[in-house]
């Protein structure tokens, strides 16, 4: 995270993966009686919405489309929404789009947070899967601005993508100590304690950077293979970071069914990751293709796709 000094006792907490952490953080933060907005990208990681609804808040969706480089148009959010907002979720690199927020965009969001007094929760689980340059993180921007207290800023990260350990359920939350202190108190009742063996395995994974670089190299090779072999058959656009293709198709559900029926390849229809808004459903006519299989399996997938395209 390019931070020189972070007090591990006040500015971070270990969690059982970011799914659990995101859900419980929302429950700890939201005042149900206020029925505030939680602003989030659309499409999105489904825990954002589920946690919001179960906390008694209202989701407000910002459509992430090709027109706004899949980053959303924060200027289009009405002032009356910001005034009632308790929490803003961002995901950078994005799931499913792979889009990365710039330093300038983070600064704009921090200014909005100061103006309207809401919390920014940055889901950065894909932040270590990049091609040429590491993406900027929220806390890094805070430090550059001299905000060493990280006021109203929280980051979520885990071993799931970085180390290919999604089943171990291990991650951390870092940021504003004034938010983490009551969140820790909530967690003492929540009962989410990490077993010692998971702690030891987590330490080993966090301490080793070579396997992370090896992981990045493998993803680079897989994306290069897909671009070379299928770029003339499919509108493949390499993401800014992450391991997903966000592929434009004529009809996402039909495309997914055809791939499953004819080639036994599973992709996720984009409409399942997004919600209908007044501007439409930004996930429609897209599918999410995850390059998480090894290179040999990816080569097999490519041959199967060539046979039916």
What are these regions (language model features)?
Residues 2-309:
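PLP-dependent class I/II
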């Amino acid at each position: 995270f390019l931070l020189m000094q972070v007090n591990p006792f006040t500015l971070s907490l270990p969690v059982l993966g970011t799914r659990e952490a995101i859900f419980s953080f929302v429950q700890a933060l939201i005042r149900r009686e206020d029925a505030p907005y939680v602003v989030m990208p659309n499409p999105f990681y489904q825990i954002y919405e589920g946690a919001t609804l179960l906390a008694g808040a209202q989701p407000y969706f910002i459509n992430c489309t090709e027109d706004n480089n899949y980053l959303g148009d924060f200027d289009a959010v009405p002032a009356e929404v910001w005034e009632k907002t308790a929490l803003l979720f961002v995901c950078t690199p994005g799931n499913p789009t792979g889009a990365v927020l710039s330093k300038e965009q983070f600064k704009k969001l921090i200014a909005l947070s100061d103006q309207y007094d809401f919390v920014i929760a940055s889901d950065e689980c894909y932040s270590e899967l990049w091609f040429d340059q590491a993406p900027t993180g929220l806390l890094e921007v805070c430090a550059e601005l001299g905000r060493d207290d990280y006021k109203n800023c929280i980051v979520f990260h885990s071993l799931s993508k970085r180390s290919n350990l999604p089943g171990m359920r291990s991650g951390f939350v870092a940021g504003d100590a004034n938010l983490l202190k009551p969140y820790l108190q909530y967690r003492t009742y929540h009962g989410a304690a990490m077993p010692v063996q998971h702690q030891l395995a987590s330490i080993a994974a966090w301490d080793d950077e070579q396997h992370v670089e090896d992981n990045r190299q493998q993803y680079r090779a897989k994306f290069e293979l897909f671009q070379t072999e299928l770029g003339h058959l499919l509108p493949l656009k390499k993401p800014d970071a992450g391991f997903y293709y966000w592929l434009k198709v004529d009809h996402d559900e039909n495309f997914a069914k055809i791939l499953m029926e004819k080639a036994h390849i599973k992709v996720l229809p984009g409409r399942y990751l997004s919600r209908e808004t007044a501007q439409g459903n930004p996930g429609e006519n897209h599918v999410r293709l995850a390059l998480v299989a090894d290179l040999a399996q990816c080569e097999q997938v490519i041959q199967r796709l060539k046979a039916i395209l």
